[in-house]
Amino acid sequence: AGVVAKKVLADATIPDDASVNEINARIVEIGGVDFSTSLEMTEGALEMTKGALEMTGEPLEMTGEAQRVLEQAIKDGDSIGAVVECVVPDIDLGYGEPFWDSVESVISHAIFSIPGVRGIEFGDGFKAAAMRGSEHNDPIGPDGRPLKNGAGGVNGGITNGAPIVFRVAFKPTSSISRPQQTFNFQTGEMDTLAVKGRHDVCFALRTPVIVEAMTAIALADLIALK
C-alpha cells in the first residue's frame, strides 16, 4: 500500500510544479545515543550485530557509543528502543484541516498503527515546552514561507510550505532472554520468565521504511481530501 501511495504522491502535481515524491526516514537515536549525522553502518558493526538483529535492507552506520550500546544489550540479553526521524521536504502549503483531519493527526493515526510506536513529535516537539514564544515562533519570509521550522511544517493543522519533520519513538523489544519476575497464572505465584529463542535487540532498526510507507499513505489521503 505504501508503494501505491508513493506512486500517487509522485503523480500529484502541486501548485509550484513540484511533486511530493520524496519521503526520507532514518534512525537518529538508539538506546538514548544520538547519531543523527550517521547514515550507514560500518561493515564491522553490521557483521557483529547481523545475527542478533536479523537486519534487512540498507544498513546504518553507528557511532562508537551507539555500537557499544547495541553490543552491551546483546551481552545482557536485553533490548533497546530507538527514534526514527522522517522528513517530507517537498510539500506545498494548504494540505490538512484545522481540526479532526489536521496533518499531525492524520500522520499520527497512520504511524501509531505500526506496532511498537510509543510516541510522535513534530518540529521542536516536546522541546517546545521549555521554550519561550519568541524562540518557538517561526518568522514568515517574503515568499510567505517560514524562515525556520520549529513547527515541523504544520501550522493550525495545515501544511505551511516548509518540510514536514517529525520523530517517532519505538519501544524496546518486549521478548528478551534476560530473566524477569512476573506472575504465573498456572501456579498462582510470582515466577521467573526468560524468553527463549532469537530476538531483535532493537527491532526499530527495521522501521524507517515502514514509517515512510505509512507517511505516504497519510499524505495521499490528505491530497485526496483537498
Go through each PLM region and give its residues.
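Electropositive phosphate-/nucleotide-binding environments in soluble metabolic enzymes
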Residues: 60-64, 97, 101, 105, ...
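Residue-level recognition of conserved structural "scaffold" positions that shape functional pockets
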Residues: 32, 159-163, 195
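Alpha-helical support elements that line or immediately flank enzyme active sites
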Residues: 1-12, 105, 109, 162-164, ...
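Internal helix-turn-beta structural module
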Residues: 173-226
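Context-gated lysine
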Residues: 6-7, 50, 75, 127, ...
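Glycine-rich, mobile lid/loop segments that gate access to catalytic sites or pores
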Residues: 1-99
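Glycine-rich anion/phosphate-binding loop at the beta-strand->alpha-helix junction
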Residues: 77-80, 84-190
